[in-house]
């Protein structure tokens, strides 16, 4: 069906090209999420290769063969994922052979590998499917970047078709060890991002004008982000010339509405220690509050080990600020520390779905070890005491203006009759505006509900948008300003029953 690719005819403006063929009924039926194509696109892009197409096909030999035949003749590299194995629906080798009009045969080296893994096998046994490859197949043994050792199992390629496994961990290991197979095009792509706090409709005309002027020299992508606390649109400039991309970025910023470009820190967690401690050394009022809070946290770390401390975390704005402070203090004190930051979550009845989603995102961002318990605070602490008797101190995001908190001190033992813990309160002297200034100065992610008019969050049964943030926009529609725009902080709890 297909002939061996003529590489020179599959270049695009001097750049190597690729197509990705994802094989598997489980993808098309929604049983499995495809992460392989995203990984491959990123990896190939870094190697200067333009991915022109991603196709998903079922485990049907004729369908796979047709796609392999068509795609392999139009791109420099065709990468397949999935359909390698001992079962009836693993038909990728057969399909590639059909595409190139070749027979399958038991490759001697593949046979040895199969026997070494499965033991003695017969020609008609299921494991032998792994050794049956197209006649012109080549075995490519990659090098593990971490160990420097040759990978045990090879990547099979046929002409310009590279047949990867479908299991993400195996595919990623194989690709990382064989990236040299796809390098050498000489192309380097240069990308710049611009974050804009404006709707796409407000900037669409400017973007069209700029793209028309640049033509094919620079590509401009516009991507709305409904879940960001700091921007509404991410603009991506892409070209193979660093001079062109820098020139385009300057033109883009000049063309956008004044004040709409956000100098976003895209990964505030990785620079937390540097940025938080830099802020603490400033002579601003916020800097002094940060320095005092860090002092309390550092005193706790002097007294307790990391494994004896946890952060009380429910996803609210105060404990989000506290978590970032504590994370910064830990990274400053133990830059190579392996202990995960521990957090205690007392789950309430009827939590907001947005809050639950934010909790899961936060666990990933900070690599938290989360203890989730239910019930009253006393019941929860009793349960934690049984499950984790080594914990001795709980960092809390309490402020002095919170109910029943005006007599607290930075270090407060729990009351008699309660489980024995030290309550550590680094934020006692912080105000509502201090919390928001800290979060937004450092671009720390927080629960999106705070951008929708909520100023204090509990459950869905007792939390409402704050009437003080209600407004009517230019279209006459009722909207709510974000929580950080609340002027009178004494009205903070007007959104709670």
From Swiss-Prot:
Key words of the record: ATP-binding, Cytoplasm, FAD, Flavoprotein, FMN, Nucleotide-binding, Nucleotidyltransferase, Transferase
Gene: flad1
Pathway(s) annotated for this protein in UniProt: Cofactor biosynthesis; FAD biosynthesis; FAD from FMN: step 1/1
Protein's recorded name: FAD synthase
Family statement: In the N-terminal section; belongs to the MoaB/Mog family. In the C-terminal section; belongs to the PAPS reductase family. FAD1 subfamily.
Major localization class: cytoplasm
Names of required cofactors: Mg(2+)
Species for this entry: Danio rerio
CDD domains the record matches: cinA, FAD_synthase
